[in-house]
């Protein structure tokens, strides 16, 4: 397994864990992570030499850019809203926001797939700062770092003299999602406390 495939595998494992854990309680977080994980699964295959998944990998990466970060932002910012709690609302968001994003990108508005995750990242950073939770703040900063790598990374660029831009994107994204998806400890304590 080459280093690019390994970085996608790490991202896949993080996203699959988050999606599995949060599917019933936080579907927006779960589906957002799941879409990124699906793109990562196809990336593992692509970077392992399976040429026929190049197109599907690009499509699901685009879909994840257009809607997954929106779902993550909504799930973190408004955890009690319908978009964060109801699977049907999450499904509609994927179809509408993802469909519009893919259509706009195909029609030549390529910045759409960068603007939406960028705005979502700002919402996530703002939410993390308001919550004053260290893991969420670090996760949000790692997420912003992954977007910076995606926007500025060129082939041949090395980060920390070791990771190319693809690997840096995947590892930053994996670490950011893992930290952002950690449930609040007080919320866990409240849920596990015996009724009064």
Predicted regions and their residues:
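Physicochemical signature of membrane-embedded alpha-helices that form the seven-helix bundle of GPCRs
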Residues: 3-10, 31-35, 57-64, 90, ...
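Membrane-proximal helix-loop-helix units in multi-pass membrane proteins
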Residues: 58-128
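C-terminal transmembrane-bundle signature of multipass membrane proteins
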Residues: 130-196
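Aromatic-anchored segments of alpha-helical transmembrane domains
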Residues: 35-45, 94-105, 141-154
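Hydrophobic cores of alpha-helical transmembrane segments in multi-pass inner/ER membrane proteins
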Residues: 7-18, 63-78, 119-126, 170-187
